[in-house]
């Protein structure tokens, strides 16, 4: 089974405090940096169970983006990316967790994912259609998601990522093979 995943790699910064969160205050705690991104996490898990997986993504020329890309390649993942650019850093996700470890706030910058746009996808659509399954996340813009549903002739699996981004899939519900 051949699977192609289209979406983002994030550099996740996760801050957790041991104290009650108070607005406008600095809180002692711990900060961890880790590889993330819904699509990247799925790709890693598929590779670890020895599935044939290809990843369409975009990373910046920064240390973490290049490292996380290299880590996936070492697992046997084939990566397809738009041409390199200095315009963007890799996607960054910042979460603030409370003392119970529950995420209270998060902010994400996925500007680099704009390189995986309708025009770029149209240049590789024939390749995409050679796979058995196509998995997308909703970090892609609406035009790109619409184009994929119009042109892909294989089952499309979607991860909605968040409540806010899930609305991008509403008009395609009847075409989605699996939705998470």
Q: How would you name each of these model-derived features?
A:
Residues 1-9, 71-84, 96-180:
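Ribokinase/PfkB-type carbohydrate-kinase core domain
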Residues 86-88:
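Short, glycine-/polar-rich solvent-exposed loops and beta-turns at beta-strand/coil boundaries
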Residues 1-58, 63-77:
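Glycine-rich phosphate/adenosyl-contacting loop at the front of the ribokinase-like
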Residues 90-95:
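Short alpha-helix plus adjacent loop in nuclease-associated cores
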